[in-house]
């Protein structure tokens, strides 16, 4: 394996996050795509998913980006401190 092809693992706290739409999720792990070497966030919904998937993956860059809500930039996901 050639490690020079991999980008460093992002420094991201695991645990509870709130999505900008209001639902809560538990970030379980960061995973690296086998082909692109892009980092992904593996997270699980902390609400009744009503038959929808409970565990999700999203590119790290998308998970940590800001979104524009009524002219205000807000984090897509915000770390929650208990």
Question: What residue spans do the PLM features occupy?
Answer:
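Mixed-charge, low-complexity intrinsically disordered regions
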Residues: 1-82
């Amino acid at each position: 394996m050639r490690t020079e092809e991999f980008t460093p693992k992002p420094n991201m706290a695991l645990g509870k996050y709130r999505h900008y739409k209001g639902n809560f999720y538990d970030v379980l792990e960061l995973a690296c795509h086998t082909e692109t070497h892009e980092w992904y966030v593996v997270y699980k919904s902390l609400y009744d998913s009503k038959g929808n998937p409970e565990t999700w993956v999203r590119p790290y860059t998308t998970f940590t980006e800001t979104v524009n809500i009524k002219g205000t930039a807000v984090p897509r996901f915000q770390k929650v401190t208990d």
